[in-house]
Each structure stands twice: as structure tokens, then as C-alpha cells.
Amino acid sequence: MEQTICHRVASVEFWDGYARWYKLWMEHNHYHDRIISRLMDNVEPGWRVLDIGSGNGVLSLPLCAIGCEVTALEPSVGMRNLLFAEAFARGMDWIQVDARTLEQIPLYTYRNLDLIMACNSLHLTEQGLAQALTRIFSFNTKRVFLVSELYPGIEALPESEDYTLRFSEYYETESSFAYHHIGEVLDHWTFKKGEKLSDQELRDITKILAVQDDHLWIKDNATVGMFWWEKNQIS
């Protein structure tokens, strides 16, 4: 089943439907806290920022809050709706949104920005992580911030003679899912698979469920890597 899921998540259509599950996941964990903290330590107010695969704005909106000019690149309408809802809830109406994919953007569109960032999104592009990162370097941005989970078969990160890797950091974090009832569990996993679950899959899912704080949990952890490059000559 995991192989089927991995193939499907690389499509925009998958994320249109998965947005409700992403929202549920976000509401019950602190996955992005350390990433946001790193950004706050390194980003300055007024920077022009492009967030590739912004999702619900979990990284974009904190930068908007400190006065950055942020464009959220998000091709999924389902995920954009989460972004708009979150921006409205925070009273932020100045974030810019671009509904194109990375591959659809001409190189001249976002030249000479202060920062381009991507969190768990480049491996979902048509090009794959390595080629997508190489393309980002060609935008001539002053800084690049990449967040990616480490998984079997992950591509080696490309190097660029124009950029220096200023820091890289790996850490373990919780990435658990919390559900309100068993029907929600089964709906989620059925959507991920794209078809009815087999009896064996139902048994396997039931075995890993844990009850905690009036929720059903599927506990999980992820190894996350954070990487920050700077252009060798920043004007």
C-alpha cells in the first residue's frame, strides 16, 4: 500500500483531496515548531520570500507577521483554501499567492529574491528534489532554505559553485496522526490508498492504533533535515 501512496502524493489532485487530512494532522502535532524557530533566527523583516509548496502557510504566515513580502506558491486548490482560511484567521491579507507549479514558473519571474524556501515539497515536483533544487539556484536568490524528511532512496543534494551551505541540521520529530473516531481512521487510509482497504490492511491499521486524550492515534516519527545556502556574493 505504501508504494501506491508514494506514487499518488506527487500529483496536485491528491493534495486537493488530502487537504482535510493535512489540516487534521496540523491540528494535533508540533512538527513545524523547530523549523519556524530556525527561520525566525535567520530571516529579517522586509525580505522578499518565495515559499514553494506553501500548504496552509505554516511557514509563510509567520514571515508575513514580521514584515516579509511573501509569495506562497501552491498549485493545489485544496491547500490554498487552507492557506486563505489561516490567513483570514490571523488577519493577514497581504500575502501573495501563486497557483502555478515550480515547473510552470519562468526563471525571470522570481529573480533576486532574499529567500526561496521549500518544506517537504521539492520531491513532489515533476523534476524530483535534486533537479528542482538546481533550478532554484538558477533563480539567483540570495538564500535558499530547504526542509526535507530523510527517506530511503532520497536523492543526494546537488552543489552549486555560486552558493555555500551555511548550515545543515538533522533531528527527530513526532509526526503522529490523531483521529476522533474509527470512521475517520478508515476514511483517511482509504483515501491514501485510493481504493477499498483489504481485510489484512484493516487488521494492520487496527493493531497500531493507540488511545490517548480521547483520540485514536497512529504514532509516527520522522527524521528531518534543514539546509541553508547563501549566495557567495550578496549585494
Where are these regions (language model features)?
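A conserved beta-strand element that flanks and buttresses the S-adenosyl-L-methionine
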Residues: 117
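Short conserved loop adjoining the S-adenosyl-L-methionine
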Residues: 104-110
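Conserved beta-strand signature within the Rossmann-like core of class I S-adenosyl-L-methionine
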Residues: 141-149
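Class I SAM-dependent methyltransferase SAM/SAH-binding core
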Residues: 56-104
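A short, conserved alpha-helix within the catalytic core of class I
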Residues: 124-135
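Conserved Class I S-adenosyl-L-methionine
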Residues: 56, 169-235
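Conserved class I S-adenosyl-L-methionine
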Residues: 1-44, 46-55
